[in-house]
Curated annotation (Swiss-Prot):
InterPro entries registered for this protein in UniProt: YbaB-like_sf (IPR036894), YbaB/EbfC (IPR004401)
Keyword GTP-binding part of the UniProt annotation: no
Keyword hit for DNA-binding: yes
Protein name: Nucleoid-associated protein NT01CX_0824
Keyword field: Cytoplasm, DNA-binding
Gene3D superfamilies in UniProt: Nucleoid-associated protein YbaB-like domain (3.30.1310.10)
Location(s) in or outside the cell: Cytoplasm, Nucleoid
Disulfide bonds: none
Amino acid sequence: MARGGFPGMGGGMNINNLMKQAQKMQQQMQKVQGELEEKEFVASAGGGAVTVKANGKKEILSINIEPDVVDPDDVEMLQDLILAACNQALKTADEETANEMKKLTGGLNMPGMF
């Protein structure tokens, strides 16, 4: 094996440099993940009748319901609006997390990293 490298790689790939790059990427990923966990994502349903705020930890922070949408005879509609807004807020958080991590990893698929 070539000194400081791997066979067939021309000796240009130094394992120490590779490890340093991996550690740096891991630190950057942890930083971005922490920032995303604190970020708030807002989604609404029913033309703004129900608004949900979630964070990057996938915690629902608040649910706002416009009073005029509350109909005791149609609770199911309100439940559907709340569910739709919650799901959209969490989906938006997931998508942004995936996009930010993709930027860091250069598009490498790293399952379980975020």
